[in-house]
C-alpha cells in the first residue's frame, strides 16, 4: 500500500511529493527572487501574519542520520530526539543559510526549552550562525482573560513580522491571508473525505505527503494542486483493510505509516500536527484580524502537548468517531511523555465502546531502529476484523 503507482501517475500528486521530498527548493527559489522566508518551530505560529507580509513560512524539520555535533554540545540526551535533530540544523548554520528569521511558539514544553537555549546561545556566543528568533508565548486555557492576553501577544508578533518584512501589515492583508489559508484548509478537508469515506481512496502515507508539502511551498499553489489530486483520486482503487486512527508523535515523513500500512491497515486519520490537526479550524472573517487569528489557533482540537487528560479523551473520541476508525494506534517516541499520560484514560474510553487500541511507547527514533516493530504491527492488525467500515 503506502504511496501507490496510481498516486505517482497524478501530475499534481507528483508535484506535491517533489516538494515534500525536496523541502528547500521552493524557499531557495523564493529567496533568489528577493523574497524572505520565515522558519517555524512549533505548530502555533500564525501563518496568516507571515503570508500577509509577503513572506514564505516553512516548517523546521529533522534530518534523519545527520550527526548531532552541535546538539551534543548543548542539549541533554533526554530531549525529544526529533527536537534534538531540529536543534542541530538551527545551530549548525543550516537554517541560517535557508531562512531570514525563526518564529517559535510554545507548543510543547521541550520547544520552550529550545527557545531558552537559543536565546542564551545568541547572547553568549553571538558568532553562532543562528537566525533572528521571536518567541510566541501563548496562553492555552480557553477563557476571556487569556484570549485578551493572546491578542496582545499576537500584536507584538505582528510588530516583529513587520520589522522582518520592512513594512507595515494592514488588517486587509491579514484578512486576505486568512482567506487564502481557509481555502487551503478546505481543499485538505476535501482530500480527507477520501480517506474517511466508506470506500477510502487515499492512504495515510499519501495524505502525509499532500498535507506536509504545504509547509514548504506557496499556499495558493498548494491549494490548486490538492484540488487536482482530489479530482484524480476519485478514480484511484478503493483501499481494503482495518481502518486505523493514529495518535501520538508527529510524523515528519512517511516511514512509520508505511510500516503500519504494510501490515494491512488503512490509516484513515490522525491528530498530530503534520496531519489532520493542521487544518482543523478556519480563520473567522467576521472577527477583527488579530482576534480571528487567536480564535483559529487557540480553538483547534486539543493537542496532547497542551491539554488536560479529560480534554484529550474527548478530543480523541470525536476524531475516531468522525473517521469511523475500527482501532487506534498510539505511538510515542522516547522522551516524549506528554501523550503517554493521556493513554490510560483514552484506552478506557475507546475500549468501552468496542474500539481496540495498541500502544507503542518510548520508541526509538527513527522508527527503523525498533527491532521487531513491523511484526508487532502485523500482529495487531491481524486481530482486527472487517474491512473499510466500522461496526
Language-model-detected regions and their locations in the chain:
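Anionic-ligand anchoring segments at beta-strand to alpha-helix junctions in alpha/beta enzyme folds, i.e.
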Residues: 52-77
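Acidic/His-rich segments in extracytoplasmic proteins that coordinate ligands and/or metal ions
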Residues: 85-163
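Peripheral docking tails and interdomain loops at the edges
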Residues: 2-6, 344-391
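Glycine-rich, highly charged phosphate/nucleotide-binding loops
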Residues: 75-93, 304-318
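C-terminal hydrophobic structural anchor segments
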Residues: 309-354, 358
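Metallocofactor- and cofactor-centric catalytic cores in central/energy metabolism, strongly enriched
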Residues: 2, 18-27, 31, 35-43, ...
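A charged, amphipathic alpha-helical module
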Residues: 2-36, 151, 155, 159-280, ...
Amino acid at each position: 500500500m503506502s504511496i501507490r503507482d496510481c498516486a505517482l501517475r497524478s501530475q499534481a500528486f507528483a508535484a506535491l511529493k517533489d516538494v515534500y521530498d525536496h523541502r528547500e527548493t521552493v524557499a531557495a527559489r523564493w529567496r533568489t527572487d528577493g523574497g524572505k522566508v520565515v522558519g517555524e518551530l512549533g505548530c502555533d505560529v500564525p501563518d496568516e501574519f507571515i503570508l500577509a507580509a509577503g513572506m514564505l513560512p516553512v516548517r523546521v524539520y529533522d534530518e534523519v542520520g545527520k550527526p548531532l555535533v552541535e546538539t551534543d554540545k548543548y542539549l541533554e540526551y533526554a530531549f525529544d530526539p526529533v527536537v534534538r535533530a531540529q536543534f542541530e540544523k538551527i545551530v549548525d548554520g543550516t537554517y541560517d543559510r535557508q531562512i531570514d528569521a525563526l518564529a517559535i511558539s510554545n507548543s510543547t514544553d521541550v520547544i520552550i526549552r529550545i527557545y531558552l537555549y537559543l536565546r542564551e546561545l545568541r547572547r553568549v556566543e553571538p558568532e553562532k550562525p543562528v537566525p533572528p528568533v521571536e518567541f510566541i508565548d501563548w496562553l492555552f486555557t480557553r477563557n476571556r482573560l487569556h484570549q485578551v492576553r493572546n491578542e496582545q501577544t499576537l500584536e507584538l508578533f505582528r510588530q516583529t513580522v513587520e520589522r522582518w518584512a520592512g513594512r507595515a501589515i494592514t488588517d486587509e492583508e491579514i484578512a486576505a491571508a486568512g482567506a487564502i489559508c481557509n481555502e487551503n484548509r478546505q481543499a485538505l478537508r476535501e482530500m480527507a473525505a477520501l480517506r474517511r469515506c466508506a470506500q477510502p481512496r487515499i492512504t495515510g502515507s499519501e495524505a502525509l505527503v499532500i498535507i506536509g508539502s504545504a509547509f514548504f511551498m506557496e499556499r495558493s499553489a498548494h491549494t490548486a494542486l490538492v484540488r487536482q489530486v482530489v479530482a484524480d483520486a476519485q478514480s484511484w482503487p478503493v483501499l481494503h483493510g482495518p481502518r486505523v486512527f493514529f495518535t501520538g508523535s508527529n510524523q515528519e515523513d512517511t516511514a512509520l505509516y508505511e510500516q503500519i500500512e504494510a501490515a494491512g491497515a488503512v490509516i484513515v486519520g490522525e491528530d498530530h500536527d503534520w496531519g489532520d490537526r493542521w487544518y482543523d479550524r478556519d480563520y473567522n472573517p467576521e472577527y477583527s484580524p488579530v482576534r480571528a487569528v487567536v480564535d483559529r489557533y487557540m480553538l483547534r482540537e486539543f493537542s496532547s502537548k497542551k491539554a488536560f487528560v479529560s480534554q484529550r479523551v474527548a478530543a480523541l473520541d470525536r476524531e475516531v468517531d468522525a473517521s469511523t476508525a475500527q482501532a487506534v494506534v498510539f505511538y510515542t517516541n522516547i522522551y516524549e511523555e506528554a501523550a503517554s499520560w493521556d493513554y490510560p484514560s483514552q484506552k478506557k474510553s475507546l475500549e468501552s465502546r468496542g474500539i481496540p487500541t495498541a500502544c507503542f511507547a518510548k520508541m526509538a527514533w527513527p522508527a527503523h531502529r525498533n527491532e521487531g516493530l513491523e511484526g508487532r504491527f502485523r500482529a495487531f492488525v491481524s486481530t482486527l476484523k472487517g474491512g473499510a467500515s466500522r461496526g
